[in-house]
Amino acid sequence: MRSNSNLSSNLRRLRTEQSNDAAQDLDCKSSLEIARLINAEDATLAATVARALPQIARAIDLVAAALRGGGRLIYVGAGTSGRIAALDAAECPPTFNIDRVQFIIAGGPKALASDSEISEDDSRQGREEMARRNPGKHDVIIGIASSGRTPFTLAAIELAHHCGARTIALTCNPGSPLERAAHFAIVTPVGPEVLAGSSRMKAATAHKMVLNMISTGAMSRLGYVYGNLMVNVVPKNEKLTQRAIAILERASGAGGPAARLALEASGGRTPVALVMLAAKVPRAQAVAALKKSSGHVRRAIALATKSAPVTGEQ
């Protein structure tokens, strides 16, 4: 009983659990007034996230180094935090053609679409789920919890830290247990939600903004983009094929037919096609350049250009 009392007291002190003064009469407002209020609250998030940019940049560098060394980025969270983790991780394979960005959600995959909040309190499950991933010194683990005290996530981060992985806490409340358990923290103090305690709102939005920066920033540092183009896009359907062709046209200056031919000759590998077009080299040489540059597209183009035959024959 004492434990429950302490938990309740600690929870009520969190800023994300407190009542938002501007929303006291939420149920009496018109639809437009509700929309304006939520929009106004959301408008504060960019500035809140901006104050954490140095820590976000540190996370980008850590993740890029981990992925460059063959390690993984693993997100872990419960409830809404786990779902936004899954969303960012799921977008990395089609966008960057990498499968080493993964997620763990309390309650397992079924929790993505159903209520499994009871799993949030299961520390043992958090440790076990993390242990199954066998985290180590080459990995970066990001624990996401707006409160900074979710038992599942806290236990997972503690286990990962013990195993030698680099750990990062992403939370909305400073000085939390999760922050203390990790190597460092990214804190976005969004304040009280429009709907008191509903961290699926500002807290989740701010955290998705942070995850966008970390994953996109790390992939950019690794050279998995070219300029601001998704050159690692996987053309698995017609829409993505057209996108890949458009990217090749823009990046290389080639016409549509030449871009399509290069994409076909590359076996559907957009970066290979770009190196072929930009450096005017055959497929094998483009593949070799990308391998030598560890997938860094701009460096691969430079390498292939230096070694291209004078005739430029393909």
Question: What kind of feature is each model-predicted range?
Answer:
Residues 2-48, 52:
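Cofactor-/ligand-binding subdomain signature composed of acidic, glycine-rich
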Residues 17-20, 57-61, 72:
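Short, positively charged patches
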Residues 37-45, 103-114, 226, 253, ...:
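Gly-rich Lys/Arg/Thr-decorated short loops/hinges at beta-loop-alpha junctions or inter-strand turns
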Residues 51-66:
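A short, well-structured juxtamembrane/interface segment
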Residues 62, 156, 214:
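Aromatic/hydrophobic pocket-lining residues that form π-stacking "cages" and hydrophobic walls in ligand
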Residues 73-210, 218-222:
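Glycine-rich phosphate-binding loops that contact phosphosugars or nucleotide phosphates
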Residues 213, 218-314:
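Short, amphipathic alpha-helical interaction segments embedded in low-complexity terminal/linker regions
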